[in-house]
């Protein structure tokens, strides 16, 4: 018989407050532990049929084969921002996982959801809840609360532990190890970049209609700090979670005139070669110096919070200062990462595809 307990959000918000994300030369804070109300409630018997309404946590469960094989549904964003060639090569059965229970308006279609016969549903935060208790099965909020909204290591370790605890699986520490390895490896280079006061723009969207940047208290802001860079948008006022990703004008970007630009959902090539009408990117220092880079896309876009994002600070330093971290080092570290994290020997052609400029 399926567990029918709804895990209330207040239990998840009772986690201790984590300190502010440090500069690149400091370690990350310890991850929050799943509260007892989560850890104590595991599904009895065999592993369940798992549904995940969001995208970022799916990458974490991909690293746990015992859990992954029971996923039957995931939000469409998990596939929209992925390199399907990589996903299908790594997980040949990925096609069995459906996103059809999410409507075009991104609301849950309860009839389609129930057709999946889920035993447990994971969601992230109030915006993804969508009255999931109607399904009559165990639901788990993966929002650790507090400042973890811009602490990627703490967030992913929390997800990894919560998946293991609620599914009755042994805990692993893959993501903690991965983040600690990267932060240790980049420490001297990030410190040198920090001393140079390198000014960076983390460009979330640049589709010709709007420019959206990562302001303070965002993952993007944290990634830049890890790499030793100053976020040019770090002092902008924000309001609420959605406000952390800020619409700005081309005039504002020109006034910032960053040294380097990282493009997440958009094309670095278009920025470099004048492919976006009405935007004067060619006047910027970063464009003139060829310091505009798209974040890699593999299992998901590394620039969000993907299963590969612990490699992102390494990538950022490689692109800005290849004399510190060479292309060969990045390539080898990425190959090793896929093997360690997913037991996946990524082919050379796909590894090149992941790291290619878009």
Residue ranges and their predicted role:
Residues 259-320:
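Active-site/pore-lining binding-face segments in mid-to-C-terminal subdomains
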Residues 51-54, 58-115, 120, 125, ...:
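A short, structured surface patch at a secondary-structure boundary
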Residues 217-244:
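Alpha-helical, coiled-coil/dimerization segments enriched in small aliphatic residues
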Residues 8-20:
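Bacterial N-terminal signal peptides
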Residues 30, 40, 128-212, 294-357:
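Extracytoplasmic substrate-binding proteins
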Residues 107-117, 135, 247-257:
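Short helices/loops that flank or line small-molecule/ion binding pockets
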Residues 20-29:
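Signal peptide processing junction and immediate N-terminal pro/mature segment
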Residues 51-53, 72-75, 120-124, 139-142, ...:
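Structural recognition of the beta-strand scaffold that forms the well-ordered cores
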């Amino acid at each position: 018989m399926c567990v029918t307990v709804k895990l209330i959000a207040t239990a998840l918000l009772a986690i201790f407050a984590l300190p502010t994300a440090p500069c690149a030369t400091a370690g990350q804070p310890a991850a929050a532990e799943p509260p007892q109300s989560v850890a104590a409630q595991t599904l009895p018997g065999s592993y369940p049929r798992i549904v995940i309404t969001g995208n970022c946590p799916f990458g974490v469960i991909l690293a746990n084969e015992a859990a992954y094989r029971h996923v039957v549904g995931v939000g469409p964003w998990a596939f929209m921002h992925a390199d399907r060639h990589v996903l299908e090569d790594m997980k040949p059965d990925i096609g069995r996982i459906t996103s059809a229970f999410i409507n075009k308006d991104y609301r849950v279609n309860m009839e389609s959801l129930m057709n999946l016969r889920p035993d447990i549903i994971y969601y992230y935060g109030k915006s993804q809840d969508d009255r999931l208790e109607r399904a009559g099965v165990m639901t788990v909020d993966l929002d650790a609360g507090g400042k973890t909204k811009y602490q990627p290591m703490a967030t992913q370790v929390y997800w990894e532990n919560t998946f293991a605890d609620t599914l009755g699986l042994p805990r692993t520490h893959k993501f903690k190890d991965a983040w600690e390895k990267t932060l240790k490896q980049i420490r001297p280079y990030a410190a040198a970049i920090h001393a140079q006061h390198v000014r960076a723009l983390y460009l979330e969207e640049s589709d010709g209609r709007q420019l959206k940047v990562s302001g303070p208290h965002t993952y993007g802001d944290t990634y830049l700090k890890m790499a030793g860079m100053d976020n040019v948008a770090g002092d902008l006022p924000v309001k609420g979670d959605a406000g952390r990703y800020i619409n700005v004008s081309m005039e504002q970007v020109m006034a910032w005139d960053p040294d380097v630009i990282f493009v997440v959902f958009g094309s670095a090539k278009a920025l470099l070669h004048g492919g976006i009408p009405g935007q004067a990117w060619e006047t910027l220092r970063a464009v003139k110096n060829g310091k505009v880079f798209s974040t890699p896309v593999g299992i998901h876009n590394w620039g969000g919070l993907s299963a590969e994002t612990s490699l992102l600070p390494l990538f950022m330093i490689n692109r800005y200062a290849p004399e510190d971290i060479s292309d060969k080092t990045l390539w080898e570290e990425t190959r090793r990462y896929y093997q360690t994290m997913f037991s996946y020997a990524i082919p050379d052609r796909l590894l090149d595809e992941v790291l290619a400029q878009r």
